[in-house]
Amino acid sequence: MKFFLSLKDFKGEKFVLRSELDESSAFLCAISPTCRYVLRDEIPWKRLQRNVTSESLTDELIVDLLCGRSESKHTLQLVVLENLCRIYINYVDPFPLRIAWFELEQQALKDHEHFDVLWECSHSIKDLALASMAQQKNELQKLMAYTEQLQEECKSRERKLIMKFADMIKNARNNEDNEDNHHINYEDESDVGTDEQKQQEGVNSSAVSDTDESAVSDEFMQIKEEFPMKALSASPTADASPESAGEDDSHRRSSHESSETVSE
């Protein structure tokens, strides 16, 4: 895979660092408008010169730096010397420190070199763009699939919640109906008890009436035995005698008065 980086030296001269990397080898080429510097090395880096021992400077990190991937603690710096060029790897935390570098040998610049670099750069950009688009498409498909999965889970949970609420409403209605039926049954039992009580009261009242009637009948029979029928039959005449007696007295008095008048 080919990668292109834009670098500047201390004088501000512009360079293009072209890196061709595979599993076991690397080709580095720094090109300016006037010169060209080249380095061929193997991976692991045998021609890398280290200033200090750093465990963090691994082969993977060096490849990432040459490919242009951002790394917050390490940077690349190009310095042009006599007949060579150095690509320094700086450790910037807490202050810039050159921990390793590559030395590229100067070579003659060919007339068609710039065109080849531009052509390779355009194709590299195209390949990177296509690879990036393919990666984004793959990520988008995964995201769409994950979104559909979430939608299905949401629908399933929604259905479960609806069924749960429906069961709760159904149970509540059943409980309400059971309470109403229990209340109605209780009222019916109360009515039945009231009717039975009324019937019992009616029976008791009829028994009392019968008892009273029998008592009156017994009393009447006792009176009948004590007083003869003549007395009972004469009692109305006796009751009516005062009026008739009064009438007889008045009649007698008038007759007596009339007789006295005649005698005179």
UniProtKB/Swiss-Prot annotation:
Subunit notes for this chain? Interacts with lig4; the interaction is direct.
Q: What does this protein do?
A: Involved in double-strand break repair via non-homologous end joining (NHEJ); the repair of a double-strand break in DNA in which the two broken ends are rejoined with little or no sequence complementarity.
Principal localisation: nucleus
Q: Which domain of life is it from?
A: Eukaryota
GO annotation (BP), single? double-strand break repair via nonhomologous end joining
Where composition is biased (Polar residues), the residues are 200-209
Query: Can you name this protein?
Result: Non-homologous end-joining factor xrc4
Q: Output the lineage of the source organism.
A: Eukaryota, Fungi, Dikarya, Ascomycota, Taphrinomycotina
GO CC terms, sorted:
chromatin; cytoplasm; cytosol; DNA ligase IV complex; nucleus
Establish whether keyword Cytoplasm is in the entry. Answer: no
Basic and acidic residues bias: start-end ranges: 173-186, 248-264
Phenotype reported upon loss of the gene: Spores sensitive to ionizing radiation.
Positions of region (Disordered): 173-264
Q: Which UniProt keywords apply?
A: Nucleus
Q: Where in the cell is it found?
A: Nucleus
Which family does the record claim for this protein?
A: Belongs to the XRCC4-XLF family. XRCC4 subfamily.
